[in-house]
Structure formats: C-alpha cells, structure tokens
C-alpha cells in the first residue's frame, strides 16, 4: 500500500494516510479493512467538506450519533451502516422541540395528539363530576332490595347475551378484520386514561378477543380427518385452554387491588398485645441469622410484651450460646418431623403471646414492623393473618446473571406488588411463611401450621379462611432478606413451591369443601394453576415443530385466519397486562421466567397430581458465593436440547419453503416466525444459566442517609451514606476529603434522636467518595449498626418506585438482546468440538445486527450536532 500511495499522493498526505492505516491496524482492523477504511476516508475528503464547522461538530459527536460504528476499527461495509444510521437519525430519531416549517403538518398532528391526551386525562374527573348526583340522591334507594336485584339481574343477563353474541358470531376475514380494528381502536383510546376505568375497559376488550379466539379454536380449527394433526392440535389446544383460564383468573385476581394502609395503634401502650417473634433455622450459618435477631431486638414495641425465639432445628451449640449472649430465647427439638412447620408448631407449645410473627432466618425486619401491622388486628377481630412483602436486598439469579438488578422488576415483584394486593380485595391473601403476623387463637384452632404439604404457609392460610377468618396484606416492605444465590438453588425452591401447591390442590382442593367464598376459591385455584405451567410452556416451545417436522396441522385454518385470530389475542393480552402489571412485571419477561422453570417443575407437579404424598421438604440455601463465571451445563441441558430441536425445525422449514407446495408457503412462514421467537426465549434461558461472579460475602444495599466521620484528631466531616453492607459502607464526603487510605476514622450514624459511633478503616478514596471497612464490633455495636441501617423504617419502602415503567416494544427489544446474549455465551463456554459452530452462527447474527440503526446516545452537546446533521 505504501508504494502505491507514495506514487499517487503528495508526501504530507501520504504520511497522514500511512499513519491512519497503522492506527486502524493497531486497533485490531484486518489489513483489508484498514486499506478499505483509508480508501473510504479519501473519498469522504474528496466529496464531503469535512472541514466545515457543521461536519466538525458531527465528527465530534460521532460516538453519540453512531454508537455501533467504531471509527478506529473500520469494517468493509461501514459506509452502508453510516447511510442507514444517518437516514434513521434524519427520519426516525429526530427529537426537536421546535418543528421546522417544512414539518408543519407533523407539528399540527402533534398538537392534535397533545389535545387528545389532555382531554383523556381530564375525562375521569368530568365523568365523576357528571355522576356525582347519583351518589348524593341514591336514585335507586327507594326501591326494595328485591327490585334492585331484579334490575341488576336484567343488566347482567343482557350483558352476557351481548358478550355471547360477540364471542360466537362467525365473521369472514374482512368482517373479522373490521371488528378487530374497532376493538383495537377502542383499546388505544382508553389505554392512556388514568385511573382504573381504563384497566377495566382493556380487560373487557382483551377478554372479548381471547374468548372469541378460544371459541374459534374449539369450533373451527381441528382436523378430524388426520389422526396426527388431531392429536397434535388437541395437545396445543390443551395448552392454550390452560393459558386462557390463567389469563381470565389473573384478570379477576388483580382487577381492583386494595392497597391497604396501616391502622394506628392506641396511644395507651398497655392496650398493645404481646407478640412472639419466631426465627426458625436449620443449617444456615450463624452470620446469616445474627442480623435478623439484632434487628428484632430493635423493633419498636414494649419490651415486656415482646419475646424473640430462635428455633434451631440443627441443635447447634453456637446458636444456643449466641441466644444467651444477646438475651433471646432458644428452642431445639430432639426430633425433626415436618421440617419448618414442625419446628414452629413445637415452639407454639412454649410461646404464650397473643400474636406470633415469623421471619425466615435471613429476613431482617424494620423497627416499624409491628407498629405497621398489628393495628389492623385491633380494628378487625376476625383478622387472623397479616402478610407483608418478601423483599430482597440481594439480586436473584435472573437479576445477577443478566445484570438487571434494580433495572427490571424481578420475578417476585408481580406477586408481592400486585397479586397479593389483588387477593386482599377478595379476602384471599396467602400466608407466605415469613414477614407475617398471625393471631394465636385462630392458629391454635386449626392445630398450628399445616404439615400435610411442603408449602405449609399457603395451606395454613387456606385452613384459616375455611374457618371463616379473614386475612390482610400490606404492600409496604417491612423486612428484607437474601435471594437465592444460584439458578440451581432458585429452581429447587420453585420445585418445592410447585409440588406443594399441587399437593394442596389434591388434598384440600379449594374448589370443594366448606368455608370459602367463591372469590377465595378462584384466587387459590389460580395460584395453584400458576405452578402447572411447565407442561403448557413446553408445548408452546415445540408446537410449531409439529407442522415443520410432522406436517401436522395443529391449527387447521388458513394462515390469514390464524393471523386474524392469534395476533389480536396475544396483542390485547400483552397491552392489558402492560397497563395492569407494568410497574411489577415488564412485557415478555414472563416468557423467560416460565421457560427457565418449565422443564423442572413439569415432572414434580405431574407426580404430585398422581401421588400427592410423594416428595420431601428441601431448605433453600442462602448466603453462598460464586467464585468464577461459568455455565451451569446441568441446568442448561434441557434448554440446549430444545434449541437444537428448534434449529432442526428451522432447517426443515427453509427446505419446505423453497421445495414444498406453494400453497403452504405462508403457513411455513408463520411457523418459522414462531420457531424464531421460541429460539429467542430459549436463548434468554441459556443466558440466565451463565452464573456470574458473586464474591461478596456481604451484599451492598444502596441508600441515601446523612452521616458524619471523625478523624482521630477530632476533625469532623459531614457525609452521605451511599451504600452499606454488614462489612462496610460507601460514603460521599460533602466537600474536600482530607482522608487517606488505611486511616482509622469513626462513623457517626443516627437512629431517631440517638447517635451511634462505629470504628472503621478507610479502604479506598476516589475523590470525595470513600469506602469504609467496619472494624471488629462488639455485640452491642453490631446490634446498633444493624438497627441504624438494615432495620431503618424507610430503608426498603421506595425500592418499588425505582423501576421504570413498562414499554412493550422496548421490553421486546430487551428480550431479543437477551436471547442473542445467551447464544454468545454458548459460543464462549461451549466445548471446543462445537465452539466453532456457535461462533460462526453468533458472528453471522452479530454481522446482521450491526446494520440495525441505533438511537443516539444523547449528551449535553449532542443537540447542535443533531441539528447540523439535519442541515446537510
């Protein structure tokens, strides 16, 4: 190259070009790519005035405007990427506050859209104002109860007839399309309305479309002339029916969350009841249990009415000694029947409090726990149980392995953020085994904690409800604990839950027997059905292969009709769930959670249906470490098998598209789209199975709290605590940090009006951000530290609000990236014999993805460059 350029170019230009070539090579570009990059640069200098200030601003903002193109390491087709990204920036990603004259039409449309949103936001208030007289005058109040029931019956009957017509009326493709457009238009109109009315309307529209789909599936899509197609079609229809039932029950369960607030306690503390706090443990490390006991000692409650018990099913002497040192009671059984339930029932023989509060040994209660919960028991004499959320300050395997901690709602957020709140509306709150208060008298009436199943908590609440007692749920987190440390431990925990809920379904079926209200029966059944999702999920992951591999028509209908029925059913359900669940579960993430668990919960739930007494209780390990990143090949084996099976389907589908009957081409395309979606979800499951490092023994908790540090010479600095753990803190000093690494300082924290001092050592200094390591603490200092940090009343309350709102399209893009990430991990960790194949496939996909335009990474200086780009 140097000889050619020396002959063609003058020396200064040649020297600069050679320097650019060497720079490209230094950054990893191949010789061909570097040569081509120099050629493109010459063409750019010839045809584009790069010295112009506008182009200079664009070049300065290259990293923001073209985030996927590395200017220091060119690739052969970078000009195509530049062209696509530039068109995207000009057409699709422009965000100018002041529209240009040539876009007045678009500006007018935006004004109309703004007025429409304003009108929709004001609509609920106007409707409330217009209908206020109905509440004031009680226009039906003069009618007898029988007449009001008659009117209600007529309205319900008319509504059911209308719904039946909408569901069963057959349409040709055009009429079906028009009908769907009307419903879709209605959904788009109401989805932005605030309040619960929009959610109710979306539920009605979604149920209309979904019920119509199920009716169509049962009446028009089974091929009775082909045994293979009939069997495969019935299997898929079984899975779809299950999904439809869960959808309907789920809407019912969360249609009107109660959002219960605390009831204040009497000012006279003599009226406050006595409470026993149980902390059961079996094989956990003492360090895991200590924080729970220390926090319990600081609960705001009269000390003469509070008894704390360590229930040690391991019979360990160090636990007995620890209990004696801190002044709590200790019980150890000689026998260990019925695991945790038996441990608690044994303690009930000795405890005499009016209420019992149970915490898993890693769940650290806040100081306000009892004051926030017990007030309801004094107000409602039939209230037997009050449950609060299980909040986790460490990432679960999904969050840690995917790097999504506090960025996406975790798996349990939906249940504790919305489902339990919805259950509370129907008086069907479940006891979850920890972070709860139970009235002792009803608990004694049912014989203590249920021992017949491995999910003793849910079974206990079912028995309380059968006795006519009520339950309650408060969504405000009042305790926090450790999430499972590995995917295998997480799956083991879910297997136990799944087996236990199916055991309850068989042994104490909520649909039968006395004592339950209809709504309670539905809520319990939906909880049990949730854990039966394994087999239906596996069916969905393999269903399109029936047509591609076996030529079985699982949905015996034209591809156009399949699209007109299937897509609206899925889109309406996704839109409705996004509206209802958006703060607690982002769109499409349920697919990942269910896929990871499906293979493992399917066998135990099936066994429990057949033999409910089979199975044993297993304790979930907490507080472990993951020393190195690795793929859990044992856990991921089923996912890889399903990936390979679907890849075979892709290969056969491609062959059938080019060489099969022309009449089946559209059906092949539909099946291939389904297969590719399944591959994305399975890739996400593989990504979860890559265990990330977890080398901290003490998890850091992010929070903002005022504090101060004092040097040995007495000089004080005000600071803000940014995070803390059981072993240290991260602080930000307000001002200049005149502190050195290794220096010993005292940390001053406040709890209420009391100030506490803790000895620390400076572990790191980065500007005004300082890392502190706690020096060895006395028992009392450790108690004080836990109560100043983990047990603060406001520590966990705002975590839920930190999650971003759900945006379905962005969430779908996240799942696409996640799926691709899983296959990249397979390429990285696969055995050498197959690593080459995975690398070729992932490199091919990466190459295709590199052409997709990206939204610019906005910065403070990006605006002028964006404007300059639009003017070229």
From Swiss-Prot:
Essential cofactor(s): Mg(2+)
Keywords: c-di-GMP, Cell inner membrane, Cell membrane, Cellulose biosynthesis, Glycosyltransferase, Membrane, Transferase, Transmembrane, Transmembrane helix
Enzyme Commission number(s) from the entry: 2.4.1.12
Activity regulation remarks: Activated by bis-(3'-5') cyclic diguanylic acid (c-di-GMP).
GO biological process: cellulose biosynthetic process; UDP-alpha-D-glucose metabolic process
Region spans: Catalytic subdomain B: 441-501
Residue spans crossing the bilayer: 30-50, 151-171, 173-193, 230-250, 525-545, 547-567, 592-612, 640-660, 668-688, 833-853
Pfam family, one: PilZ
Its membrane topology: Multi-pass membrane protein
CDD domains: CESA_CelA_like
GO CC terms: plasma membrane
Catalytic activity as recorded in UniProt: [(1->4)-beta-D-glucosyl](n) + UDP-alpha-D-glucose = [(1->4)-beta-D-glucosyl](n+1) + UDP + H(+)
Binding positions for substrate per the UniProt entry: 360, 362
Protein function: Catalytic subunit of cellulose synthase. It polymerizes uridine 5'-diphosphate glucose to cellulose, which is produced as an extracellular component for mechanical and chemical protection at the onset of the stationary phase, when the cells exhibit multicellular behavior (rdar morphotype). Coexpression of cellulose and thin aggregative fimbriae leads to a hydrophobic network with tightly packed cells embedded in a highly inert matrix.
Family, per entry: Belongs to the glycosyltransferase 2 family.
NCBIfam families: CelA, PRK11498.1
Name under which the protein is recorded: Cellulose synthase catalytic subunit [UDP-forming]
Species per Swiss-Prot/TrEMBL record: Escherichia coli O157:H7
């Amino acid at each position: 190259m140097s000889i050619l350029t020396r002959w063609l170019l003058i020396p200064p230009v040649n020297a600069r070009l050679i320097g650019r070539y060497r720079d490209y090579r230094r950054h990893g570009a191949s010789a061909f790519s570097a040569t081509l990059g120099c050629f493109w640069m010459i063409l750019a200098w010839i045809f584009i005035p790069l010295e112009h200030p506008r182009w200079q601003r664009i070049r300065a903002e290259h990293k923001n405007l073209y985030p996927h193109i590395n200017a220091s390491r060119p690739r052969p087709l970078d000009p195509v990427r530049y062209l696509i990204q530039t068109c995207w920036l000009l057409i699709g990603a422009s965000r100018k506050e002041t529209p240009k004259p040539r876009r007045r039409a678009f500006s007018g449309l935006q004004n109309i859209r703004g007025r429409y949103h304003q009108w929709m936001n004001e609509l609920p208030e106007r409707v409330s104002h217009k209908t206020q007289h109905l509440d004031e005058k009680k226009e039906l109040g003069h009618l007898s109860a029988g007449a009001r029931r008659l009117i209600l019956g007529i309205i319900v009957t008319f509504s059911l007839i209308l719904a039946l017509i909408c569901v069963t009326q057959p349409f040709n493709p055009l009429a079906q399309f028009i009908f769907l457009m009307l419903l879709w238009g209605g959904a788009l109109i109401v989805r932005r309305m605030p309040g619960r009315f929009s959610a109710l309307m979306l539920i009605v529209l979604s149920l209309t479309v979904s019920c119509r789909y199920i009716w169509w599936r049962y009446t028009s899509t089974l091929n009775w002339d082909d045994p293979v197609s009939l069997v495969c079609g019935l299997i898929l229809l079984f899975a779809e029916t299950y999904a439809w039932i869960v959808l309907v029950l789920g809407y019912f369960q969360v249609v009107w969350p109660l959002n219960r607030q605390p009831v204040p306690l009497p000012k006279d503390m003599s009226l406050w009841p006595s409470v026993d706090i149980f902390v059961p443990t079996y094989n956990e490390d003492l360090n895991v249990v200590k924080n729970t006991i220390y926090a319990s000692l600081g609960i705001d409650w009269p000390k003469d009415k509070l008894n704390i018990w360590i229930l040690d099913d391991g019979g360990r002497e160090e636990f007995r000694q620890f209990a004696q040192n801190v002044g709590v009671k200790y019980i150890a059984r000689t026998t260990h029947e019925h695991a945790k339930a038996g441990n608690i029932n044994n303690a009930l023989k000795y405890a005499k409090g009016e209420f019992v509060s149970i915490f898993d040994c890693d769940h650290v209660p806040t100081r306000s726990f009892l004051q926030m919960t017990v007030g309801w028991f004094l107000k409602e004499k039939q209230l037997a149980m009050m449950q609060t959320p299980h909040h986790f300050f460490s990432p679960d395997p999904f969050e840690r392995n995917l790097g999504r901690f506090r960025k996406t709602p975790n798996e349990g957020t939906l249940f504790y953020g919305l489902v339990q709140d919805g259950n509370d509306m129907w008086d069907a709150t479940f006891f979850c085994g920890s972070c709860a208060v139970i009235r002792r008298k009803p608990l004694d009436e049912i014989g203590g904690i249920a021992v017949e199943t491995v999910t003793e908590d849910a079974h206990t609440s079912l028995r309380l409800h059968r006795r006519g007692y009520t339950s309650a749920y408060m969504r405000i987190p009042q305790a926090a604990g450790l999430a499972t440390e590995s995917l295998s431990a997480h799956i083991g925990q879910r297997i136990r839950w799944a087996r236990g809920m199916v055991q309850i379904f068989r042994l104490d079926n909520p649909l039968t027997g006395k004592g339950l209200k209809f709504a309670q029966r539905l809520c319990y059944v939906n909880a049990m059905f949730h854990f039966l999702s394994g087999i239906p999920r596996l069916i969905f992951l393999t269903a399109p292969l029936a047509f591609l591999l076996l030529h079985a028509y699982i949905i015996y209908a034209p591809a156009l009709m399949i699209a007109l029925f299937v897509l609206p059913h899925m889109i309406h359900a996704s839109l409705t769930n996004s509206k209802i669940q958006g703060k607690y579960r982002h769109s499409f993430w349920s697919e990942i959670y269910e896929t990871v668990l499906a293979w493992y919960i399917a066998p135990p739930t099936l066994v429990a249906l057949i033999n409910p007494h089979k199975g044993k209780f297993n304790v979930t390990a907490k507080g472990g470490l993951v020393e190195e990143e690795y793929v859990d090949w044992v856990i991921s084996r089923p996912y890889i098998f399903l990936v390979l099976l679907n890849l075979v389907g892709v290969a056969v589908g491609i062959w059938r598209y080019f060489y099969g009957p022309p009449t089946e081409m559209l059906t092949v395309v539909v099946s291939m789209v389904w297969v590719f979606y399944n591959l994305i979800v399975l890739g996400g499951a593989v990504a979860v199975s890559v265990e990330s490092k977890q080398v901290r023994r003490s998890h850091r908790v992010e929070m903002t709290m005022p504090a101060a540090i004092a040097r040995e010479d007495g000089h004080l600095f005000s600071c803000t605590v940014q995070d803390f753990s059981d072993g240290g803190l991260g602080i930000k000093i307000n001002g200049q940090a005149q502190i050195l690494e290794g220096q010993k300082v005292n940390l001053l924290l406040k709890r209420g009006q009391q100030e506490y001092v803790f000895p620390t050592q400076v572990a790191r200094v980065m500007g005004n951000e300082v890392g502190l390591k706690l020096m060895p603490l006395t028992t009392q200092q450790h108690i004080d530290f836990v109560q100043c940090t983990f047990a603060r009343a406001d520590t966990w309350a705002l975590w839920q609000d930190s999650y971003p709102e759900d945006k379905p399209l962005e969430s779908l893009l996240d799942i696409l990236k996640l799926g691709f990430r899983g296959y990249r991990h397979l390429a990285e960790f696969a055995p050498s014999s197959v690593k080459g194949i995975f690398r070729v496939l992932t490199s091919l996909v990466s190459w295709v993805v590199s052409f997709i335009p990206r939204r610019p990474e906005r910065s403070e200086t990006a605006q002028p460059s964006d404007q300059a780009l639009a003017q070229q």
